[in-house]
Regions:
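Short, charge-rich amphipathic alpha-helices with coiled-coil/heptad character
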Residues: 1-23
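Long amphipathic alpha-helical coiled-coil segments
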Residues: 29-32, 36-37, 72-105
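Extended alpha-helical coiled-coil "stalk/arm" regions
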Residues: 29-60
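Short acidic DE-rich linear segments
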Residues: 1-5, 104-110
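Short A/G/S/P-biased low-complexity tracts
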Residues: 12-15, 64, 97-106
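Short, glycine/alanine-rich amphipathic alpha-helical segment
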Residues: 51-80
């Protein structure tokens, strides 16, 4: 990024982006946590429905379609969450750089 073009308008855009994505970020974070619990429940459910020894039942639970579906749902939610999280972190870095540059300008360092 060209730091000469980092002005108040760009910082305002960053703040707007952060404000507009607050709820989505929180919702996706909650969904990721919820689906992580769903993975455990799917595995436990498949384990309880299986027959055999503990090790065999564990392997059957991990190989079950219900467990695979839960993993897939979690992965999809996690990818969406990380995408918005990374975008928000980028905007936060823009704001942090702006603060540093502004401070340096006030002190006469730049």
């Amino acid at each position: 990024m060209n730091l000469d073009k980092l002005d108040e308008n760009r910082v305002e855009m960053a703040l707007t982006k952060l404000a507009e994505t607050n709820e989505l970020h929180a919702a996706l974070g909650g969904q990721v946590n919820y689906l992580a619990e769903g993975i455990k429940q799917a595995k436990a459910h498949s384990f309880l429905l299986s027959e055999g020894g503990v090790s065999e039942r564990e392997q059957k639970a991990i190989a079950s379609q219900k467990y695979a579906d839960a993993l897939d749902a979690h992965l999809q939610a996690y990818v969406q969450f990380k995408k918005i999280d990374n975008e928000r972190q980028h905007e936060q870095r823009i704001i942090d750089i702006w603060r540093t540059l502004s401070s340096n300008r006030r002190q006469g360092s730049i």
